[in-house]
């Protein structure tokens, strides 16, 4: 404590004139501590938010660029329509599509799906670079 604080009857034990901070009581000290912690947490949160926004913008740019490629666009439309068809089928039937079907039907369906997926992969690999704008 400074010499003036020793003689000041109103000075609190938390007063410290050397660093310019005067705390009249523990409540003010706690409030300042909380403000500092909240400012620090806010700065960290802002940093994370800015990084998230930056990564989201980069992702959106890549998506926009990729969707200009007709191969990617056709794949997106094809795959999303298949997913919608399957979800609609399961929702309407409340059971598996192939439940109770003969093994030959299950195998033919599986082979057909695998064949279409393979064909899609081959066609995509062949034509992707032709339309790539990167």
Swiss-Prot record:
Transmembrane spans: 71-87, 105-123
Membrane topology according to the record: Multi-pass membrane protein
InterPro entries: OM14 (IPR039454), OM14_C (IPR039453)
Subcellular location: Mitochondrion outer membrane
A Gene Ontology term for the protein's cellular component: mitochondrion
Keywords annotated in UniProt: Membrane, Mitochondrion, Mitochondrion outer membrane, Phosphoprotein, Transmembrane, Transmembrane helix
Modified residues (Phosphoserine): 12, 15
S-S bonds: none
Molecular function (Gene Ontology), one example: nascent polypeptide-associated complex binding
Ranges where the record places region Disordered: 1-23
Gene Ontology BP term (one): protein targeting to mitochondrion
Primary subcellular site in the record, as a coarse category: mitochondrion
Taxonomic superkingdom: Eukaryota
Extra remark beyond the main annotation: Present with 4750 molecules/cell in log phase SD medium.
Identification of the protein by name: Mitochondrial outer membrane protein OM14
Organism (species): Saccharomyces cerevisiae (strain ATCC 204508 / S288c) (Baker's yeast)
């Amino acid at each position: 404590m400074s010499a003036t604080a020793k003689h000041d009857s109103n000075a609190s034990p938390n007063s410290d004139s050397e660093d310019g901070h005067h705390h009249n009581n523990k409540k003010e000290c706690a409030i300042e501590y909380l403000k500092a912690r909240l400012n620090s947490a806010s700065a960290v949160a802002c940093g994370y938010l800015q990084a998230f926004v930056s990564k989201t913008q980069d992702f959106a740019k890549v998506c926009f660029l990729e969707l200009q490629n007709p191969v990617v666009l056709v794949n997106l439309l094809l795959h999303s329509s298949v997913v919608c068809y399957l979800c609609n089928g399961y929702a309407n039937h409340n059971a598996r599509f192939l439940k109770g079907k003969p093994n030959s039907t299950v195998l033919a369906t599986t082979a057909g799906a695998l064949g279409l997926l393979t064909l899609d992969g081959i066609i995509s690999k062949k034509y992707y670079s032709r339309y790539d704008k990167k």
